[in-house]
Amino acid sequence: TPLLRVVIYDGEADENILNRIHSKISGRPNAVLIHYDEVIRNGKQNMVGPAPTQGKDVACIMYTSGSTGKPKGVILTNDNLIATIASVTMLLKPYLNQSDSYLAYLPLAHILEFVVECYMMYYGIAIGYGRVKTLTSNSVRKCEGDLVAFRPTLLVGVPAVWELIRKGIVSKVQAASATKKKLFDMSMWAKSNNIPLFKQFAESVVFKSVRAQTGGRIRYALSGGAPIARETHQFLNTALTTIIQGSVSY
């Protein structure tokens, strides 16, 4: 590659190979062929002290998706991130503890995921990593989906993911017997209308099997990125868990 300037190698390299590499980069300005041990020695001989950052220093350049125009590189400062994490703290801290676990699956190029992961790391909450395409057991073959395998207590998502989870639950219900489908519908109605006795049965029997599809331990979920559909929000609030919504459309 014409841009290559520095080659670092380790172990005992073949002299002929080193000569060939050197001949290819020797004509380039500031080109270096150096052993890893020498890199370590140079570092020890030229120690650089820590350089504390300031609030106005750039922490990240986050690119927008481009859904409403050309993607833009948004410059985020340390102050931006700290303020955002502080707002997430105000929202989530009363409900979380050290025994919680968080399943991360959105790309870190997604600002919601980036901020929430920073928060989880700051408070020492365990993070597991998955993928959108392997979240549910319906999406994979001969193995468990990420939600069932990791069994998180916290989940963050965007509308498309919540719709995927809702469809997974509905497909399981539709594949069940007529009696089980009727029980599910009655349970949704009883909980939505706060009917005490049947609501208890729904929580302990019907919805327990529904929640098993997402690992059975989710206590809270956060939705962002765009408004979640009202029907999906109400369905999952009833059948799965409380979903705190960051965007409202109704």
Please describe what each predicted stretch is:
Residues P2-V6, A31, I125, R217-I218, ...:
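A short helix->loop->beta-strand "cap" motif at the edges of active sites that frequently abuts
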Residues G27, V32-I34, I40-Y63, K70, ...:
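Conserved pre-ATP/AMP-binding loop-to-beta segment of ANL
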Residues A59-I85:
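Conserved AMP-binding A3 loop
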Residues Y105-H110, A226-P227:
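Conserved AMP-binding
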Residues T1-L3, N16-R20, W162-A175, S204-G216, ...:
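Adenylate-forming
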Residues I82-S101, A109-S204, A239-L240:
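Conserved AMP-binding/adenylation subdomain of ANL enzymes
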Residues T1-R41:
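Structural core segment of the AMP-binding/adenylate-forming
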Residues G11, D185, W189-Q213, I218-T241:
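Short gly/Ser/Thr-rich phosphate-binding loop of adenylate-forming enzymes
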